[in-house]
A protein has these predicted regions:
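Conserved positions within compact, well-structured domain cores
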Residues: 46-257
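Short N-terminal segments immediately surrounding and downstream of signal-peptide cleavage
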Residues: 20-35, 58-62
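Generic structural signal for beta-strand residues in well-ordered domains
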Residues: 11-17, 32, 141, 185
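Short intrinsically disordered, low-complexity coil segments enriched in acidic
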Residues: 4, 28, 154-155
């Protein structure tokens, strides 16, 4: 399993044959040696919203987007919101920017996505906002071997972290870069790394609560036009679970099968 490198020391040296090499001392204590002749460029990145004290894996979706993953209890979750624009079989998901068209999906039961404020720069790190028809579609929007979690699977996550009264804080990234001025109770001790990416309203099709709230779809339907979601906010450590109509715009976190 690939891992995200969160800390390393890079040194240039010579091998026994006199070849220039790069010594990479990883934060797990191991040494990786790479000949400089094999290196075209070096890119160092640190996802500051992750928990640097935990080990992350990776998963790649059907569009080639790679996400960190984290084991929490017996479950393995994506540690970022989904960014794909297709279902797992390659079928495209509509990008709906117009608020009226966004609301009208209830009459057609059509899956759709949008960026917050229709601004593609929010794709990373916040992800795409999807409607509920995407989350419940049998074609599966998650990568192969992963799925949109059910209400009960979210309950399992919350219970492992101490219950709905405190689990939200353990899911939220720390600080106020991605949560505005409050982020009360945000510890990210789980490594889930939730960010305050906002919502798309199912009442007017507009965008609200950026840096203040994050909602995720479950695959558990209430009716053919509504489903359960889970949510965290900047004002406390709670995890909220409730139902909403499928023309709301929420994020998706995938769970390994």
């Amino acid at each position: 399993m690939k891992q995200f490198l969160t800390c390393a020391l890079l040194l240039i040296g010579l091998s026994a044959s006199g070849q220039a090499i790069m010594n990479i001392f990883q934060n797990n204590g191991s040494l990786l040696q790479v000949p400089l002749s094999d290196i075209d460029s070096i890119t160092y990145s640190f996802l500051e919203y992750l928990n640097p004290g935990l080990t992350y894996g990776t998963v790649t979706d059907q569009n080639g987007n790679t996400y960190p993953t984290i084991v929490i209890g017996t479950q393995e979750w994506m540690a970022e919101n989904l960014r794909t624009a297709t279902y797992s079989n390659g079928d495209p998901i509509m990008n709906l920017t117009d608020p009226v068209q966004w609301l009208d999906v209830l009459s057609t039961s059509t899956g759709a996505w949008a960026h917050y404020e229709n601004n593609p720069s929010y794709d990373m790190p916040y992800g795409k906002l999807y409607n509920g028809f995407v989350a419940t579609d049998p074609r599966n929007v998650c990568p192969t071997g992963w799925h949109v979690p059910t209400f009960n699977e979210w309950t399992q996550l919350s219970n492992y972290l101490g219950g709905d009264g405190v689990s939200g804080g353990k899911l939220k990234s720390i600080g106020t870069v991605y949560w505005g001025s409050n982020n009360i109770g945000g510890t990210n001790e789980s490594g889930f790394s939730a960010l305050g990416g906002g919502i798309r309203s199912n009442s007017d099709g507009n965008f609200y609560l950026f840096l203040g709230q994050s909602n995720w779809w479950t695959s558990t339907e209430i009716t053919s036009l509504s489903a359960y979601i889970s949510a965290v906010g900047d004002t406390g450590p709670q995890l909220y679970r409730f139902s909403t109509d499928n023309n709301a715009g929420c994020f998706i976190r995938c769970l390994r099968d």
